[in-house]
């Protein structure tokens, strides 16, 4: 009987150790020599380091002026460093953009600096208002890249980005000259229509708008360009678009607007309309004021 119990305990412990290896914060984990050398080379002045494993990466938690976490693969290849910084340490353009945004009155919860392999540094301001929490992603020059509802699922927060295929990089360089890549993600929700598509966020100077714009470039499962979209301010909408809406949708107010370039050759504005006593609706309008049905 004792032997059976002992055997069961061994089996349970083995199963538990396998289950926990995806997120292991045991200080005794073995860190390969190549990884130790890579970390010391990148952060030569850091002394006290605590290693853990997350999502298949080795993560070094340390203090170097601020609390930080550096993500590596087993062979010593660096992928990301996340640094917890005070609001005052943000670049001035980021602070100015935030303080002029719709979120300026929200409570600031946390600020992170994300440095990742082969892409631009991104700053994330976590804000909350009553039961709502939002992560605001900014480039160093103050362009709002995206706003994401915070689900408190910290296991998936700020993971290293997907490696961008060379063919996609070449396409972006050709179509959007001078663009800076700030985010790469593959849609993994099987319930979404674009499951398996690659989303690439870029900062691109738009000569028509005469400003830097955050654009989302979408590639299909085969790696072919599918579409590019970006937010448009109301005062940037063509007069033909606003006139068509005022005629066809009297009583509605324009809210958010996005511009879409499609690989099919069509382009249009997608505009959210708010009605006083009617449900909100989304419409598509071409630059000449044609409303697409």
Where in the sequence are the language-model features?
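Bacterial Sec-dependent N-terminal signal peptides
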Residues: 2-6, 10-45
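First exposed extracellular module after export/assembly in secreted or surface-exposed proteins
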Residues: 28-293
């Amino acid at each position: 009987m004792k032997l059976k119990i002992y055997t069961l305990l061994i089996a349970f412990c083995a199963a538990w150790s396998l289950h926990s290896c995806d997120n292991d914060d045991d200080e005794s984990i073995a860190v390969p020599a190549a990884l130790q050398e890579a970390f010391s080379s990148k952060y030569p002045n850091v002394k006290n380091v605590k290693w853990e494993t997350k999502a298949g990466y080795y993560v070094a938690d340390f203090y170097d002026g601020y609390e930080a976490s550096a993500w590596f693969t087993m062979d010593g290849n660096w992928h990301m460093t996340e640094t917890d910084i005070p609001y005052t340490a943000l670049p001035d353009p980021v602070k100015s953009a935030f303080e002029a945004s719709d979120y300026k009155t929200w409570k600031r919860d946390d600020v992170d600096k994300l440095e990742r392999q082969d892409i631009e540094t991104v700053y994330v301001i976590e804000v909350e208002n009553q039961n709502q929490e939002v992560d605001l992603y900014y480039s160093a020059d103050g362009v709002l890249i995206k706003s994401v509802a915070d689900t408190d699922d910290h296991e998936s927060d700020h993971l290293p980005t997907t490696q961008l295929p060379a063919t996609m990089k070449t396409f972006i360089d050709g179509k959007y000259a001078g663009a800076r890549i700030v985010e790469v993600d593959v849609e993994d929700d099987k319930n979404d229509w674009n499951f398996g598509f690659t989303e690439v966020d870029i900062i691109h100077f738009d000569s028509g708008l005469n400003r830097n714009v955050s654009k989302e470039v979408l590639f299909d499962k085969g790696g072919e360009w599918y579409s590019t979209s970006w937010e448009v301010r109301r005062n940037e909408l063509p007069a033909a678009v606003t006139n068509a809406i005022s005629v066809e949708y009297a009583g509605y107010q324009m809210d958010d607007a996005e511009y879409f370039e499609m690989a099919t050759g069509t382009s249009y504005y997608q505009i959210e309309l708010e009605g006083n006593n009617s449900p909100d609706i989304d419409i598509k309008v071409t630059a000449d004021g044609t409303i697409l049905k």
